[in-house]
Regions:
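Short, basic, helix/turn surface patches
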Residues: 74-88, 128-138, 252-255
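Fold-level recognition of mixed alpha/beta catalytic cores in primary-metabolism enzymes, strongest
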Residues: 65, 71, 91-192, 196, ...
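Short acidic, glycine/serine/threonine-rich loops at helix termini
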Residues: 21-22, 62-66, 113-118, 135-137, ...
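Amphipathic alpha-helical segments in well-structured domains
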Residues: 37, 121, 211-215
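Amidase signature
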Residues: 1, 166-255
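Generic structural signal for helix capping and beta-alpha/helix-loop junctions
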Residues: 59-61, 111-112, 205, 238
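Gly/Ser-rich catalytic/binding loops embedded in alpha/beta enzyme cores
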Residues: 1-109, 224
Length: 255
């Protein structure tokens, strides 16, 4: 019996489970079952969670939708003509469809946040060193410079908080040396927050419905008493160049 006792939790395909495939969309990994559990899988079992399914991803988990040559395409349960996002799009679709009360995805550049936005659910993209990804199947084996993180996906903020506290209270730093030994802390939110809004990233112009949604959000935040400032993306290209230099083979783009 633990804090997650009896709770069904779905897992993104890259979480290795002994005896099961973790293809992450590669046909070359079909029928090559794992011979051990990912560390988080063992932790969830000790906390009482019930694992019952793994969910779809794009090949190598590197695009913002979920389609591959093993399981096909995952679509949005709210509108099957739209994507459920990626790379944790199998999780977002299942949770939005109420097929899973809580799921675990992973994220480097938006793989939790994009699917959650596409399907209207909640997620947390934590800092590195909080939730262990030890023993997971990588889509970019050997790439250690920019680390993936994992986080919960659910239909309420209370679910996200409950899961996060349970994992941190389980002291993951005792089983994964990359985890930071920082206990759970209750923090009172400030009544007034300063929030930045990105109207345009300097690369892709948002469509009118996205801009309208941003304006509506800004109006509601201001009415709630928060300070909203515009975010200038002028340094984003520099950050992207740095990312390419440390993440990709030879630090180069090849076209």
């Amino acid at each position: 019996v633990g804090p997650l006792h009896g709770l069904p939790i779905s897992l993104k395909d890259n979480f290795k489970i002994k005896g099961k495939d973790s293809t992450v969309g590669f046909t070359s990994l079909v029928d090559k079952p794992a011979d051990y559990n990912a560390t988080l899988v063992d932790m969830l079992e000790k906390l009482g969670a019930v694992r019952y399914c793994k969910t779809n991803v794009p090949t190598a988990m590197m695009i913002a939708e979920s389609v591959n040559n093993v399981f096909g395409r995952t679509v949005n349960p709210l509108n099957r003509k739209l994507t459920s996002g990626g790379s944790s799009g199998g999780e977002s679709a299942l949770i939005a469809f109420r097929g899973s009360p809580l799921g675990i995805g992973t994220d480097i550049g938006g793989s939790l946040r994009i699917p959650a936005a596409c399907t209207g659910i909640f997620t947390l993209r934590p800092s590195h060193g909080r939730f262990t990804t030890q023993g997971c199947q990588s889509g970019l084996t050997g790439q250690e410079a920019v680390q993936s993180v994992n986080g919960p996906m659910g239909t309420t903020l209370e679910d996200i908080t409950m899961y996060s506290k349970a994992i941190v209270d389980a002291k993951p730093w005792l089983v994964d040396p990359k985890m930071l030994p920082i206990p759970w802390r209750e923090v009172e939110s400030k009544e007034k927050l300063k929030i930045a809004v990105l109207w345009n990233d300097g690369v892709c112009s948002p469509t009118p419905p996205v801009t309208r949604a941003l304006r509506q959000t800004v109006d509601k935040l201001k009415k709630a008493g928060h300070e909203v400032v515009d975010w200038d993306p002028k340094l984003h290209p520099l950050a992207l160049d740095f990312l390419v230099s440390v993440q990709y083979d030879s630090g180069q783009n090849i076209h």
